[in-house]
């Protein structure tokens, strides 16, 4: 633990202030590492060629509803890396195709929207508290789209995208969330079992 590590290094129990500084430094280092990982993720998917050799891998990533601290950090740093772009000229990365999932009560609420519109700059700068835990990420996603074309947006509350088993209290609720591919393919319904996007894909188009 942090306390045990501090005792080993300093030879005494850490105070509240010391623990706070340790936590802040660890958090900053983790954020930096996460950002570099997202930069590498985008770079690799725009430079690694498929086995055909004539194009990069057509890849997609869906996100927006993970409210855990680590999940939110990954989303935020991915958005930042997308705005930064590729190389010294900051070229817009084509891949992965990014899809931000909009879900009422998670990444959107009408009340939060109205509040943000009263002072949009303050909302973007993180100076407001919102009801929906990921509404701030939704705003950052909109800003990213305005600058870098991605992410696209998918609305999980659209009647044909809803899953009656989705529960905000379920830590594995992602199993009941629709995910799409960048080619706009929506693989979700299932005539032979439970509808889900997990483990699904295309073999051919019909």
Report residues per predicted region:
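Conserved catalytic cores of very large enzyme subunits
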Residues: 1-206
């Amino acid at each position: 633990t942090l306390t045990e590590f501090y005792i080993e290094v300093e030879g005494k129990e850490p105070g509240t202030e010391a623990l706070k500084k340790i936590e802040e430094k660890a958090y900053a280092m983790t954020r930096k590492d996460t950002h570099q990982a997202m930069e590498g993720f985008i770079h690799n998917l725009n430079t690694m060629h498929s086995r055909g050799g004539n194009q990069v891998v057509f890849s997609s990533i869906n996100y927006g509803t993970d409210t855990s601290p680590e999940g939110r950090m990954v989303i935020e740093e991915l958005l930042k890396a997308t705005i930064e772009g590729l190389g010294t000229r900051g070229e817009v990365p084509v891949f992965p195709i990014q899809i931000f999932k909009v879900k009422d009560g998670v990444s959107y609420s009408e009340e939060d929207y109205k509040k943000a519109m009263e002072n949009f700059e303050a909302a973007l700068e993180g100076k407001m508290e919102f009801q929906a835990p990921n509404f701030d990420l939704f705003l950052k996603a909109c800003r990213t789209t305005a600058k870098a074309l991605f992410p696209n947006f998918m609305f999980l509350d659209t009647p044909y995208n809803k899953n009656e088993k989705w529960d905000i209290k379920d830590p594995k609720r992602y199993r009941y969330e629709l995910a799409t591919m960048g080619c706009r393919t929506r693989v979700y319904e299932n005539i032979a079992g439970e509808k889900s996007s997990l483990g699904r894909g295309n073999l051919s188009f019909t």
